[in-house]
């Protein structure tokens, strides 16, 4: 099964790739701004690495068209400090990038898109709460 991981050279993306490989998946593409072999480490020769920007629709279309994934793990995003420093770029990458991934998935008939967010979207004062799909999100930073 072909799998695409946006943000695939990030901390979570690399762990998802590792878990998929350990489960027997063999056709994994990591899509990231800097998917260098140094960044990918021991996964460099086990995944297809594609450089690109999730906030650029052409880049997203190209990688989805080329790889025809059945499943897309959408993990690519700008993190807290850069998002707060440059809100316009954060909107382009995080909001529009998500739209671009969903639209490319629709156009090229990916079976599933799995999206992972951040604890930053829930804000403060959530200790002890069980987080689920109905948990109120109260971000305190632009990133959230």
Predicted regions mapped to residue ranges:
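N-terminal Rossmann NAD(P)H-binding glycine-rich loop of SDR-like oxidoreductase domains
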Residues: 2-23
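SDR active-site strand-loop-helix element
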Residues: 6, 31, 72-78, 113-119
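NAD(P)-cofactor binding segment of oxidoreductase domains
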Residues: 14, 18, 85-114
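Conserved glycine-rich Rossmann-like NAD(P)H-binding loop of the short-chain dehydrogenase/reductase
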Residues: 25-37
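Rossmann-fold cofactor-recognition segment
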Residues: 44-56
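NAD(P)H-binding glycine-rich loop region in Rossmannoid oxidoreductase-like domains
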Residues: 54-93, 124
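Short-chain dehydrogenase/reductase
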Residues: 89-91, 95, 129, 140-144
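Conserved Rossmann-fold NAD(P)-dependent oxidoreductase catalytic core, especially the SDR/UDP-sugar
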Residues: 99-141
């Amino acid at each position: 099964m072909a799998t695409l991981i946006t943000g695939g050279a990030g901390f979570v993306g690399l762990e998802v790739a590792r878990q998929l490989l350990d489960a027997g998946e063999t056709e994994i593409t990591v899509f990231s701004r800097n998917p260098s072999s140094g960044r990918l480490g021991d996964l460099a020769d086990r995944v297809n690495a594609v450089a690109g920007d999730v906030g650029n629709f052409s880049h997203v279309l190209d990688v989805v068209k080329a790889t025809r994934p059945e499943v897309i793990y959408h993990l690519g995003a700008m993190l807290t400090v850069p998002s707060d420093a440059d809100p316009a770029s954060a909107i382009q990458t995080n909001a529009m990038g998500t739209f671009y991934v969903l639209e490319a998935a629709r156009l090229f008939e990916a079976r599933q898109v799995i999206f992972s967010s951040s604890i930053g979207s829930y804000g403060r004062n959530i200790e002890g709460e069980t987080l689920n799909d109905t948990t109120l999100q109260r971000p305190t930073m632009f990133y959230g």
